[in-house]
A protein has these predicted regions:
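ATP-binding glycine-rich loop module of kinase domains
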Residues: 1-30
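Conserved structural core of kinase catalytic domains
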Residues: 26-74
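Conserved alphaE helix
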Residues: 73-85
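Catalytic-loop of the protein kinase fold
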Residues: 86-102, 106
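Conserved protein kinase catalytic/activation segment
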Residues: 103-115
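Activation of the activation-loop gatekeeper triad in protein kinase-fold domains
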Residues: 116-121
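Conserved activation segment of eukaryotic-like protein kinases, specifically the C-terminal portion
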Residues: 128-142
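Helical subdomain adjoining the active site within ATP-dependent kinase catalytic cores
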Residues: 166-247
Length: 248
């Protein structure tokens, strides 16, 4: 967080080379912009990315607080906002690459804004390998570096949506399964995960057919979750307005 030209901005520094920063961030990338001292006598010039500062908390922090307070109304608002964001992501020809609640800011104005696009996929990167695999707590367990296309956000989008819908129905799930590393579920053992099983039972009991079908996709053997976009569209149908935030 810095002040520049009378405005509060964000400044991200890169201590090691990163692929495709120019393609991802465009003119926001300032190459060899900052000199960092590594010792009293030596230092290194590093690349930086200048962006808009977004006042707010991460989605993970906001969800944890709302669940602890049993604030179902706030959780219901968050899940509606997230489903619209998820639909936009999974129908785009780009992908975030490391979609997780810690990389989404809930702005003070009530918008959801993704941050940290370093692992993004753009159409120009077709055929390349992924520079990183994202955070394991939200990624399909079968994801490898070879999986690098516009669909790599499918699994984390479905997982986060499922967890938010479950918490909006029963915030006490956070007491039993909430985690600083994830939300409720462990992808590596999703089929036997007690939180996942409890979620399916909850959705079935409440007649939440769309959410039940999205949750079922989390056991798919592939990263591409066929039908996810249509299910998310059905979930947000009739919802008015947009969860807008500054473009990347």
């Amino acid at each position: 967080r810095i002040r520049l030209g009378g405005r509060i901005r964000s400044l991200r520094c890169y201590l090691r080379p990163m692929r495709h920063l120019k393609e991802i961030y465009g003119q926001r990338l300032l190459e060899k912009e900052l000199y960092l001292h590594t010792s009293p006598e030596t230092g290194v010039w590093v690349d930086t990315v200048l962006g808009n500062w977004i006042e707010g908390s991460t989605l993970h922090e906001t969800v944890a607080q709302a669940a602890a307070l049993r604030d179902r109304e706030s959780l219901q608002i968050l899940v509606r906002l997230f489903d619209r964001l998820a639909l936009a992501l999974v129908t785009d020809d780009r992908a975030h690459g490391d979609l997780k609640p810690e990389n989404i800011i809930v702005g003070d104005d009530g918008t959801l804004c993704p941050i940290d696009f370093d692992a993004s996929y753009l159409p120009a990167f077709a055929g390349e390998i992924s520079p990183e695999l994202g955070t394991a707590a939200y990624q399909h367990p079968a994801r490898t570096a070879a999986d690098f296309d516009e669909r790599i956000d499918d699994y984390p989008a479905a997982l986060i949506s499922t967890a938010l819908h479950a918490l909006a129905e029963d915030p006490t799930l956070w007491d039993r399964y909430g985690s600083s590393d994830g939300l409720l579920y462990t992808p590596q053992r999703i089929a036997s995960d007690p939180a996942y099983r409890e979620t399916l039972a909850l959705f079935e009991k409440r007649g939440m057919a769309v959410q039940y079908r999205i949750a079922q996709l989390l056991t798919a053997p592939t990263l591409r979750l066929f039908g996810l976009a249509e299910l998310l569209a059905e979930a947000v149908r009739g919802d008015i307005g947009e969860a807008g935030c500054p473009r990347r």
